[in-house]
Amino acid sequence: MAPSASEARRATAALLLLLAATSGAAQDAYPTDITPPPGTRYPCALTALPRGLPGIPEGDRSYVNHTYARLLRATQAKLVLLKAIEEARGIEPALARYRDTTRGLAARQGSEAVPVGIEPFQADVLGALELQQIFFAKAAALRQSGRGMDAVYGVREGREASARLIAAWSRMQGRYPGWPPATRDSIYHHLCALDLF
């Protein structure tokens, strides 16, 4: 026996509600807990992205949510590796974990659908991640050869990555001039926390 028209409408409505709920959950990749890894701390006043991303147009929210979730994970991986390099202890395994993490994050970021107009920001973020990977490979080698942190911070790619993150911040400011302070500050501090300087 076929369902009545009323039953079919209710079933369709229920399915649409389920799909909408699933879609919203899938779009929110940002973690609820942003605590830094044990024994590390963020170098700036990092706060979680505000839920719903006030001030970010709806068409950009999924991209911004996914991007900043990845930037947070890259920052956490950076903190663990930087601690190992500073302490000159456990560098190789920390470098291997960092490489695996950031390569995966960069690959996912590179395959993300980029809203029109955000392409230069995307290029800066991916460029900064690549430069930081080069920086950390060189930094690990320097520390393992007995060099100090002054030599590590002299590695050119670290400054170049910093410049790309500053450019990324400028692009975000230009795109969202009317965003509220909580959104602006959180986005700024995500880029600041990933930076090396």
What are these model-derived regions, one by one?
Residues 20-23:
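N-terminal signal peptide c-region/cleavage motif recognized by signal peptidases
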Residues 103-106, 110, 133, 137, ...:
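Structural signal for well-ordered, non-membrane alpha-helices
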Residues 127-133:
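Heptad-repeat alpha-helical coiled-coil/4-helix-bundle sensor or tether segments in soluble regions
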Residues 26-27:
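Boundary of Sec targeting at the N-terminus
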